[in-house]
């Protein structure tokens, strides 16, 4: 196998685009703090809806990857590269599965529901929590975003290493 299955490639790039949007809307919400409450609520809803969408896509991606497999790294790839690639992929999957759930819990803990793109309410059992609990979830979500950003930077650095330094065809696995 020289490339990932077409469904995996599609989900990979769709997820990448959605993550960029998550950081865009998340940054806008946090750093520009819109004064218009309706606009602010819409930004939060878009960010949260995209987060839930990413979570579903990652679940689908895991199922498809288990069913279709993945191309192997070249046999001459150093052992350290193999270990780092595996750890980075596992960590990315873990964060992409946990981060949206923490975000949803964060939203709910402050007493807000999530209406997925205004189409239906996403159920969540925790409901409004004391402010200190809600703030802990907010902090966890922020640290999760920072962790995701660092993992994505490492993932991109790995892709650049394979594409520009080793020139070993690994980048074509996802192209």
Residue ranges with predicted function:
Residues 1-175:
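Membrane-embedded alpha-helical bundles that constitute the cytochrome b-like, heme-associated redox core
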